[in-house]
């Protein structure tokens, strides 16, 4: 999954968690810094719990990443929806779901290429953050239903 704004609602968080616990390889690619500090702070609060259950979270370092894609086996999704409540409940979004091995393979290859410009989130990375940053991220998480 590639998304510029990752502030998942409970159903998405549960789906990612249960998939990882079942042994499914789940990887998420987000920008290291987005154009919204609040969204970036809120997103970081989800990383630790996802990594603990086996989800691999990658932070894209090169520039602002704005792709919105998902690949599951031979199924690919490309669209305008971010992985956040605003896209799920408020904004008018569109997505194309394509059952095509070639397109899914192409998107998976692009994902792998983007990983070359990314750093994988590790549990100790989040724990090394200063107290003020962890506090601001926790505050942002409280606002996540509105983001």
Description of each model-found segment:
Residues 4-147:
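PLD/PLD-like phosphodiesterase catalytic module centered on the HKD motif
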């Amino acid at each position: 999954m590639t998304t510029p704004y990752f502030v998942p609602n409970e159903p998405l968080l549960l789906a990612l968690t249960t998939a990882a616990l079942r042994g499914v390889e789940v990887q998420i690619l987000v920008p290291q810094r987005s154009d919204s500090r609040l969204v970036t702070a809120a997103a970081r609060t989800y990383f630790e719990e996802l990594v603990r259950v086996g989800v691999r979270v990658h932070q894209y370092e090169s520039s602002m990443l704005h792709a919105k894609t998902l690949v599951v086996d031979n199924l690919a999704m490309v669209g305008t929806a971010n992985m956040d409540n605003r896209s799920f409940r408020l904004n008018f979004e569109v997505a194309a779901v394509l059952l095509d091995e070639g397109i899914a393979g192409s998107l998976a290859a692009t994902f792998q290429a983007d990983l070359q410009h990314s750093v994988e989130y590790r549990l100790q990375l989040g724990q090394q953050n200063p107290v003020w940053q962890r506090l601001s991220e926790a505050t942002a998480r409280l606002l996540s239903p509105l983001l």
